[in-house]
Amino acid sequence: IKATGEGIMEMTVDTPKVRRSILPMVIVAMLFFVLGFATWLNGSLMPYLKQMLQLTPLQASLVLFSFYIAVTFTALPSAWLIRRVGYKNGMALGMAVMMLAGLLYIPAAQTQTFGLFLLAQLVIGAGQTLLQTAVNPYVVKIGPEDTAAVRISIMGILNKTAGVVAPLVFTALIVSGFTAPADATLTADQIDAMAASLVLPYLGLAAFLGLLGLAVKYSPLPELEKESDTGTGTDQLKAVLAKPALVFGVLSLFVYVAVEVIAGDTIGLFAL
């Protein structure tokens, strides 16, 4: 902002700085869309596997459990890894892990092995956790702090938009050719057809994730400064527990996500 000769305040924009921030935001926006797509795909995959593999409701719920339990034991290791390799490499590694998971769905479908599907869900959950651990703080730090909330809100909208797109894509690519009633006893040929319909879409998903990971790796995304360690892990844990608002906030988010997942991802079972 500068004053003109007539005393009028004039605002100027640092165009190069704005341009430098646009491309990183576009790339990060794509990553948030991928996160939402991978997460909300569970709601379509679970009832499909239930019918294809003739699972009980409890067994079908393991499809969700194996995905979300990955957060429990990979979140802290993801933070440790990002401190070592940086945010940008952390995002690329997260995409690589998700690509590996996409490839695991192929032998799972070909052999119709429930355990392999659960392993693929576990791996994609781990990759999603690594990617999210890297990209969330990146959104905050990539631009001015006073507009961080705006950026986070936009990314959240993209994430939820993927939740609308994911079941539509799943239906168009996988379910559209299958017309047997949900309560019908499937023949071996029908089960084979359902399994085969998963191969090409997940192969395409793996290829897309791999290409996007390479794009992130070699993109002009600026690397953020690594945070310095302050004290031991025990000291850091004590510092966190000393803040009741933070502790209760984490617990609230835990319960909220549980309710959201139950409502959003299990409703497909009642539609069968």
Name what the model sees in each region.
Residues 96-111:
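C-terminal ends and interior cores of transmembrane alpha-helices
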Residues 150-178:
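Glycine-rich segments within core transmembrane alpha-helices of 12-TM secondary carriers
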